[in-house]
Amino acid sequence: MSLATTQSIAEIRARNKELIEEVLKVYPEKTAKRRAKHLNVHQAGKSDCGVKSNIKSIPGVMTIRGCAYAGSKGVVWGPIKDMVHISHGPVGCGQYSWGSRRNYYVGTTGVDSFVTLQFTSDFQEKDIVFGGDKKLIKVLDEIQELFPLNNGITIQSECPIGLIGDDIEAVSRSKSKEYGGKTIVPVRCEGFRGVSQSLGHHIANDAVRDWIFDKLEPEGEPKFQPTPYDVAIIGDYNIGGDAWSSRILLEEMGLRVIAQWSGDGSLAELEATPKAKLNILHCYRSMNYISRHMEEKFGIPWCEYNFFGPSKIAESLRKIAGYFDDKIKEGAERVIEKYQPLVDAVIAKYRPRLEGKTVMLYVGGLRPRHVIGAYEDLGMEVVGTGYEFGHNDDYQRTAQHYVKDSTLIYDDVNGYEFERFVEKVQPDLVGSGIKEKYVFQKMGVPFPEMHSWDYSGPYHGYDGFAIFARDMDMAVNSPIWKKTKAPWKEAAKPKLLAAE
């Protein structure tokens, strides 16, 4: 059990501040001064978490961030299932981004859906010297011949494309005209842009604006009959089928989901989104830009929602219903009431097994704050959290709505810092990504992988909460953790293996 369970708030705050100072001591003075701005202990009543964010990582540290290409291709565009996404540049970026994140979809792979396939222009040295536009044209022609049912193509630029100045926009316009108006989207997401994958999200949002929305032509005959209850799910990547479990609740309360993207999304759904009455935004960090644009240009309001855990689900359903009439408000209450027996059963089964357990998180997007409510519904306490690529508004939301007094906050934490924090705080569970998973498991710390749900899920919605509770119980209470200490060390004082 964590030390947090036996200490007062003041003692925990003092311990965490001391821990930050201890971690910073190993750095050179200049580095320590820079990193100190990213580490803090939350104080109740403050409007933010007191850390600097969205700043370039220090060269030489083991940062856990990605690049702009990862943010565009790997997060925003990649899950659009009926479009082919070209990793334009050397093969490495495509190879190492292939299959690294689950995005479930409905379709026949290689025929009308292409999410799990990897397309690359395989740049060589001669392409750097003489330019890659001719190779890109050849790749586009091959895709058009081999995959004729694709509904569009995106060109995801890797670093060399921006460095040598290839005109991918001109190629896109030319080939689109040649293919009879096919949607071809050039995305300037070279990895050297920005400080993390976050700029890649923004660039991808801008590409949707400039190459999808701005090219929509006024319709003669509408493609579908609009209703007052049309909504679009934005920023759910359907990692474990989460968009589907969320969609069930929205439709049960009387709304019609006309688009969901990017997870299990299509080009047609992108094009239909400007006709929604409300955009409901799951991942604020990666999709708030396009949501704000649609509010400004099309007058579509948007709201952020959280379907992790029953408390936040009920809160979000009522928040969404507030944009509609009494029919939808009554529908929201009906849905909450319908699933209450399931919630009660899950909590009755798992809360006694998880009550008082402590958690430290370090993930991307919205999860450093959104999953806190689900843990608290199970009686667990989040004692530390941080964002890989968060901005100041993420930390404001975290401080104002999620974390408790004395919570340890760490932005762009590196491998050294995170390991030292876990050693000293001794949480019962650490939730982070695949790069951290095996480090902490070898330290004897239960670890659910919180980027892809450890190939479980969904975790969204009421059904997802049952799976989430089961997985957290399996992680924390697995008998294997009793076997991590050598028998001849059993008599020693219990502590983390890494501290030995």
UniProtKB/Swiss-Prot annotation:
Q: What reactions does this protein catalyze?
A: N2 + 8 reduced [2Fe-2S]-[ferredoxin] + 16 ATP + 16 H2O = H2 + 8 oxidized [2Fe-2S]-[ferredoxin] + 2 NH4(+) + 16 ADP + 16 phosphate + 6 H(+)
Going by the UniProt record, its keywords in alphabetical order are: ATP-binding, Iron, Iron-sulfur, Metal-binding, Molybdenum, Nitrogen fixation, Nucleotide-binding, Oxidoreductase
The Gene Ontology terms for molecular function here are: ATP binding; iron-sulfur cluster binding; metal ion binding; nitrogenase activity
What EC class is this? oxidoreductase
- What EC number is given for this enzyme? 1.18.6.1
Listed under GO cellular component are:
molybdenum-iron nitrogenase complex
List GO BP terms, alphabetically. Answer: nitrogen fixation
SUPFAM superfamilies, alphabetized: Helical backbone' metal receptor (SSF53807)
State the Pfam families in the record: Oxidored_nitro (PF00148)
Give the similarity note. Answer: Belongs to the NifD/NifK/NifE/NifN family.
Q: How does it assemble?
A: Tetramer of two alpha and two beta chains. Forms complex with the iron protein (nitrogenase component 2).
Supply the name of the protein. Answer: Nitrogenase molybdenum-iron protein alpha chain
What organism is listed for this UniProt entry?
Bradyrhizobium sp. (strain ANU 289)
